[in-house]
A protein has these predicted regions:
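Ligand-binding pockets and gating/stacking loops
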Residues: 1-199
Length: 199
């Protein structure tokens, strides 16, 4: 149960999010969890898949004999295998294929490139994408931080996303929601910031 980290909670592991922790704006960006390790080439991947399937079969036989039915995770393995070896998925995650002009339009920062990646994922059929943009907890120096960094990053990235979706004809069937979770006091504190409501 990972309520604070955006996990599936009571829904169960099958509804857990696929989290990309790598920064898409970093040089040589690749999503580790969908990248084929360089050491696994040729038939090695298929051999490993068959070995795992055989071991799983033995485990199910053992569980049946011990009258201890375990929850099968074969479907998860299969889903992961298809994702890693899918050319469509690999292409969607490869934002280096985007023209530099497009990448700059979104903003050459983590948030902007995550929005670009989100657009690419929706184009290949991913029904739900969440992009996180932290750094809004301004207890001090609120005006300068927002004016110089936080707001331009948000504005540039969101404007590029909306424009891109409209140009590609997908805006009409895409719901874009931009929200924050902070409830702030309207009063500016002595450090030129805003604090949380005290309950």
């Amino acid at each position: 149960q990972m309520s604070r980290s955006g996990g599936p909670n009571f829904l169960g592991a099958q509804y857990a999010p696929f989290i990309i922790s790598e920064n898409p704006d970093s040089k040589g960006f690749r999503v580790r969890d969908v990248s084929i390790p360089e050491s696994i080439v040729g038939d090695r991947a298929e051999n490993r898949r068959e070995l795992r399937a055989n071991l799983d079969r033995l485990q199910r036989i053992n569980d049946k004999i011990a009258n201890d039915p375990a929850v099968s995770i074969d479907g998860y393995y299969e889903q992961g295998y298809k994702l890693v070896y899918s050319e469509k998925a690999q292409a969607a995650f490869d934002i280096s294929k985007e023209p530099e002009e497009t990448r700059k339009k979104y903003g050459r920062n983590s948030f902007g490139q995550r929005l670009l990646l989100a657009r690419r994922l929706t184009e290949v059929g991913v029904p739900w994408v969440t992009v996180y943009n932290g750094g809004w907890d301004h207890h001090s120096n609120l005006f300068k931080t927002c004016k110089d960094k936080a707001l331009p990053t948000l504005d540039t990235g969101m404007a590029a996303l909306m424009e891109d979706l409209a140009e590609r004809g997908t805006l009409d069937n895409t719901l874009v929601v931009c929200l924050g979770e902070f409830g702030r006091t309207p009063k500016i504190n002595k450090n030129a910031g805003r604090d949380h409501w005290s309950f």
